[in-house]
């Protein structure tokens, strides 16, 4: 019973506590309801404060990050592999054509002695011996050309003598041969026993013949002996002529020798007693070709032979005596005269000749030829001068397929066959084919055409030249073999059927005419593909290389009125093809239609 009463008391107390709790919770709820308006009133201010606080903290964080970045090394971002792309380039600056105001050439090459091509003087005013003057007058020489008027006083003894070697640049046909032959003959006094004292080296047999004729003319009556040496004569025959005692007693028999470089080397190597120990004059004509081509290394052989003159044995007892005393042997170097229409200014090539106190003489070029208007020095190391009486023309031949017809039209309508004509081709085969083709196209020309080609024997070339001089033929078709040393008097026209391969070749080709002050014309057949090169390099004279008196003219004509000739041209080509296949047998000449 007691336990039951206790449990009831506990329940009552719990119930009372529950009631008290409810009563106490009601006033609390009332207080919270009173605080709500106050909190809402300051919520905006608090939110602004919180945002401002966060912004300040964020700014501090950023500043601390910057400080860390400045103290710590930066880490490169990883490079992503991509394809190659061109880098952007700035625009190229415009190029300016600047000419150097200085020359790398030695002074004697950079500042030559220049003379006008129009200069003329009487031979009597040049200091030539009276005996030589009579010889010249008897042969019709009374007035000296520009190169002779300038060079002869420099080589002869006198107030204007140049004590050294000479290099001479003058146009072909300007009289260079006589300009060195006259002083050479004057300087070499006759001796009781002939000695080789004058040596003239030229590249071709035609030039050997021309120089020998000039030497024999000037040496007439002087007692000087003149000989020549070329490759078409057996060396034993020349040995008997120049050294009659070749086997038992070797002694020279000539005072002046004109030779080609190859034959000179043969004599120096294989002819006993043939030496240059007494040489006083060494003349090198057409020097550009002789120095550009080796010709059995002739320069080295000649210089070695000249060095042998300084050996004690060359002076006999006196030489050995001086050598024993330790005294040097003095040997005077021969005077060297170097000539060319296209004189090289290559210092290396000229140095191989061991020139002493050299002077360059340029004929036919104005003083300002190597300078432009701004005062710069022209970059060209070569200067070419054409004869002042030469007229130049170009003939357009289209694509070149009918070039023989253009040549025929030029010969018949513009040049006339009564004049003398020299036609240049690029090869011997081309020259032979062209001569045959012209004969087939115009049968009347067959007896008036001759050829000078490399395959010709010397006798055949001589026959052609003899027929030309006698007037039997008026047209010669030749290769560049005839561009040097061939002196065809009264030649009025040169035709370049094939465009020359270089400026030098062109200068030597057209130099066959307008010689010795006579008038002459040069014609060049130019196809479309060749026009640009010819115009820039030759007609306009690239870099001022060519000095000419008149501009190159242009000639154009059509083949409209040549229907019959065109028909013969087609049949002639067929016939020419058959002749080539059958071994070149000449068919009968076709009759004119």
UniProtKB/Swiss-Prot annotation:
In this chain, ATP is annotated as bound at 170-177
**Residue ranges of domain Helicase ATP-binding in the record:** 157-361
Record has Secreted as a keyword: no
Q: SMART domains given for it?
A: DEXDc, HELICc
Q: Where is the composition biased (Acidic residues)?
A: 1-11
Give the protein name, as stated in the record. Answer: ATP-dependent RNA helicase dbp6
The record's GO CC annotations read:
nucleolus
Q: Which organism is it from?
A: Aspergillus niger (strain ATCC MYA-4892 / CBS 513.88 / FGSC A1513)
Any one Gene Ontology BP term: rRNA processing
According to the UniProt entry, what is the EC number of this protein?
3.6.4.13
UniProt-listed InterPro entries:
DEAD/DEAH_box_helicase_dom (IPR011545), Helicase_ATP-bd (IPR014001), Helicase_C-like (IPR001650), P-loop_NTPase (IPR027417), RNA-helicase_DEAD-box_CS (IPR000629), RNA_helicase_DEAD_Q_motif (IPR014014)
UniProt-listed Gene3D superfamilies: P-loop containing nucleotide triphosphate hydrolases
Biological role: ATP-binding RNA helicase involved in the biogenesis of 60S ribosomal subunits and is required for the normal formation of 25S and 5.8S rRNAs.
* Family indicated by similarity: Belongs to the DEAD box helicase family. DDX51/DBP6 subfamily.
Major location (coarse): nucleus
Reactions catalysed: ATP + H2O = ADP + phosphate + H(+)
Query: Which GO molecular function entries does the Swiss-Prot or TrEMBL record give?
Result: ATP binding; ATP hydrolysis activity; RNA binding; RNA helicase activity
